[in-house]
Amino acid sequence: MRHRNRVKKLGKPADQRRALLRALTTELIRHGRITTTLVRAKVVRSEVDKIITLAKDGSLAARRRALGYIYDKQLVHALFEQVSSRYGNRQGGYTRILHTVPRRGDNAEMAIIELV
């Protein structure tokens, strides 16, 4: 039973799960769109929304928190520069998930997650 379990474990230990989410978040912000499994896309969506909300705040503390999460320092600086013009009047919902065909090897549900 998984009653009251809020964290999607993604079949990985906590440190590997955290590293996977950081990597997927970094690549989504860098490329604007990535293809991954549906469950991973749903988990990454909340992480990306948190990072973009931090960038909208724009304070030094928010920048340092983002630098601690995203792997690329230049990407953080670019995000903080562009976010106010791109998402200034939007209150959340910065990503879109599109369902695609299942993966050939194991028939896993695949999805494209992209920045709006």
From Swiss-Prot:
Belongs to the bacterial ribosomal protein bL17 family. GO terms for cellular component: cytosolic large ribosomal subunit. Part of the 50S ribosomal subunit. Contacts protein L32. InterPro entries: Ribosomal_bL17, Ribosomal_bL17_CS, Ribosomal_bL17_sf. One of its GO terms (biological process) is translation. Keywords: Ribonucleoprotein, Ribosomal protein. PROSITE patterns: RIBOSOMAL_L17. The keyword Cell inner membrane does not apply. It comes from the Bacteria. One of its GO terms (molecular function) is structural constituent of ribosome. NCBIfam families: L17 (TIGR00059). This is Large ribosomal subunit protein bL17.
